[in-house]
Amino acid sequence: MSLRVISFVVVGLAALTLGGCMTDTLEPATQAGWNTRDKLLMSNLPYQQADIPEPYRRHIVDYTRKEAPGTVVIDSDNKFLYYVLPNGRAVRYGIAVGEEAQAWNGIAKVGRMEEWPPWIPTAGEQQRLGPLPAYVTGGPHNPMSSRGMYLYSGGKDTLYRIHGTNQPEYIGQAISSGCIRMTNEDAIDLYNHVKVGTIVVVLAPKNGDAPNSPKVALGSVPSEAATVKWY
């Protein structure tokens, strides 16, 4: 997994000089960081690309919380995921939040990562949505889609995941099943910047408005991914 050199800082400084305080910059999704398999599978999607509402597209935003650079912060209330950058900035991604995602909050770490992971429906999903196959191979037809980042706490799997989606039209919404869904493009982008051991702060319900709260949520500790590079 390659990390890329910061270049947006130069652009950001220019914008500050020309237009005053910059607070929110749209960061268009690109194929930067895609591998050969990504390009092949993403060119043959079994669903139509969705028109994601502008607030839920990838942005670089001001961030005044105290989590360390390299930390992932999930604000389920407002359907945003933040990847904290240096100098009071963060990448903000729109997400869809499933019932499983509402059932857990706290501090976790990325314990496992997988490209185009298989999907193994949980007992709850089988009960709500079944009958479902016991195992679905990886690919764009799979609800996990492009990437899976599996969260662990105390060395144990929380069963909480950050992953892609084959239903991008639901980004920005609460949905009936799943954990934290991102567009496949955004899931690939985040995957290329985190690593096993990256700290993930999942805000408790009604503890949202993440970028504007100065406190460290839930006793968050500095991320192990403290050296952060960007495009």
Across the structure, where does each feature detected by a protein language model lie?
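Acidic/polar residues at beta-strand termini and the immediately following turn/coil
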Residues: 27-29, 75, 153
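Soluble periplasmic/extracytoplasmic beta-strand elements of cell-envelope proteins
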Residues: 62, 71-75, 80-84, 92-94, ...
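N-terminal post-signal-peptidase region of extra-cytosolic proteins
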Residues: 54-80, 89-97, 129-136, 164, ...
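Exported/periplasmic cell-wall-interacting domains
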Residues: 101-102, 106, 125-231
